[in-house]
C-alpha cells in the first residue's frame, strides 16, 4: 500500500489531527529514554494517536492488511528501547487515552485507559482512600500502559510488589485486530492466566486499551528513617539485619558516598556528606505497627 493511501485510511479512523507523517513531526517519536548510542535512531513511518479502543483495533487491522509493522508507545520514558519503531511502520501512541473510567471502592479496583499517568491515578484515587502501589522513578510522566508493558516496579515494590501484582484484568487488541478481555475482579478467574502473560510482554502480544488495576488502601501512618554509616558494607549489613528482624519496609534505598555528594550538590537535602553510605527506610501501616517497627530498626 502506498504511503498516501495508508495515511488516508488512518485519517479516516482517527481524524487528520491524529496522524503524523511529516519528518519534523516524527522527530519526537524516533527516541525514547534509552541510550541513543545503544538503541540508535528509529523513526516510524507514521504516528497515529487514537482516542478509543475501537480506533486502536481499526488501525491494527489496517496495518495487518498492509503488511506494516506496528509499535505501541506510551510516554516514551522506558530505558530499554521498547517504545522505538525498530522496523519503521506505524507507531500507535496511546497518550490521548487518559480516562479513569471507574473507581470501585467496595472491590478496590479502578478501570483506566492506558494513557493515564501513573501518579495521576494515585492522586485521583487518594480522596477515596486508595493509591496505585507501583511507583517507577518516572511516575510523574510514565503511563499505566507503559507500566503494564514493562511490568514496572519502583521503590515500594519491596513491600507491595511490581505491576503484575496489581493488574486484575486487561482489554487488549490482538495483532489480528480482535479485541479481548482477560481476567477480572474475581480472585480466581477460570482458565489460563492470560493477564499474567500479557503484563511485561512489551506490546509484542497485544496493545492494552483498558486495565483493571488493584487499588491499595492508604496507610494510616508513614515514617521515614535516615541512617548514616561510615562505609557501604556496614549499611549492607544493616539491610540484612532489618529483614532478619521481621521488619518489612515499604521502601528501602541505599546511597553510596558519590550519590550522597551528587544529591547534596543538586538539592541540598541535608544528607551527611562525610558518610560512606546512607539508608532511607520507609515504614508504613497501622500507627502502632509503624512505631514498633521504627523502634526495632533504631
What kind of region is each of these model predictions?
Residues 1-298:
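Noncatalytic alpha-helical scaffold of FAD-dependent oxidoreductases
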